Amino acid sequence: MLAVQNIDLFYGAAQALRGVDLSADLGKVTCVLGRNGVGKTSLMEAIIGNEPISQGEIRWEDKDITRLPPYERARLGIAYIPQGREIFPLLSVRENLETAFAGLRRRDRNVPDEVFELFPVLQDMLGRRGGDLSGGQQQQLAIGRALVTRPRLLVLDEPTEGIQPSIIKDIGRAISYLRDKGG
């Protein structure tokens, strides 16, 4: 379980988050909703460790991770897909997926079949450059890359923004599948 308790986050003198609480249970989908500029992305950046908080606590599976760097949080099973997807445009789909190997033990360095079951288009495009994919295909690639790490918590920022409806349905089905399997 993820527990965010009374966190504050500042960018210089500007306060982005004030007293935020959030809990997310295993096997559940938790959504953070709000208009532009209210701190949704800042909250996600704090959860994954990209932005330090000035007050409060972030716990994952009963462990205080507030001061852990992002790579340690990733090792604990937290994966993040940012709003801009941040795929590598000059690398192939295969190479993009393999960038997730960096934090894995040698025996775990493979792309799980589940990635291609959820997003079959990726298998068909393994040799294509990431930058040649549509926005929706890039989002599928970003989610697939995160799934290579076999996360227990998947943090998605605006996962369907600017994507065609058919791919939104594919992403929704993938999220439902991951929820039902419990992580």
What spans do the regions from the language model cover?
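Helix-to-loop junction immediately C-terminal to a conserved catalytic motif
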Residues: 48
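ABC ATPase signature
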Residues: 91, 133, 146-147
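A short, proline-enriched helix->beta-strand linker immediately N-terminal to the Walker B motif
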Residues: 148-152
